[in-house]
Amino acid sequence: MDDIISLKNIDYSYYGKIQALKNINLLVKKGEMVGIIGLNGSGKSTLLHIINALIFPDSGEVFFKGNAVTEKSLSDKSFGIQLRQSMGYIFQNPDIQLFCPTVFDELLFAPLQLNLPIKTAEDRAEQTLLFLGIEYLKDRPVYMLSGGEKKKVAIASVLTMNPDILLIDEPLSSLDPKTQTFFIDLLLELNHAGKTIVFTTHHLDLIDHLQPKVAVLSEEHTIRKTGTASEILSDEEFLISVNLIHEHVHKHENGEHKHYHSHYVFHKH
């Protein structure tokens, strides 16, 4: 697989004072699924923002398909369009993303911004509604949607662009168990279809279900370890050291035993 995203020695701070990322190195290959896991405040969302060129690092380099991503390179219209067409970003809070009067308007917005013919945009929107099983929401005002419905519409609005890469910030945030299962199955299906997916999470269970390549962000805002899901999840001492699980000790008459808990657990039904 070819490297589609490359980050080299990335540092980023807010207002030049608050360190958010430190010496980040990460490779994402075409067709990979990559899970960035860490506690709240470790820099996960900031890292996605840098990959998507919403912000630029203080130092270090970002590459997309071998080309440097900078404010200057994005001023080249053809490269800027290529990057924006290739990447779709789903925010943790869908209310940030959704602003059109109706669901169908939301799905039309991105294709029309890419100058697709109106008929092509409408066809894509209809197909995406059917693919996600939300055609019944087509004419619904966005403000009337539930949290789970908004999340589905947010990802639908990105899929109408047919991006090669999906960047998803906390895909299971504020979702009920049934909708969590829907998104787990959807991510697996999209990756199986060839989409490159980079997501952030603090759910170890999600890593276990999706089995992506994993990058662990520490509370010091560095990538402490990368590896397969099984390599990361089986290293209990490491997970304790980055505060992703904690140890419980139970004492009995005949001794004691230890077991481990994730700080964040969801249940798949």
Predicted regions and their residues:
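H-loop/switch region of ABC-family ATPase nucleotide-binding domains
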Residues: 201-202
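H-loop (His-switch) and adjacent beta-strand-loop-beta switch element
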Residues: 214-228
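Helix-to-loop junction immediately C-terminal to a conserved catalytic motif
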Residues: 52
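ABC ATPase nucleotide-binding domains
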Residues: 234-269
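The feature captures the beta-strand-to-loop junction immediately N-terminal to the Walker
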Residues: 37-39
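Conserved ABC ATPase signature
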Residues: 141-145, 149
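Conserved ABC ATPase "signature" region
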Residues: 119-137
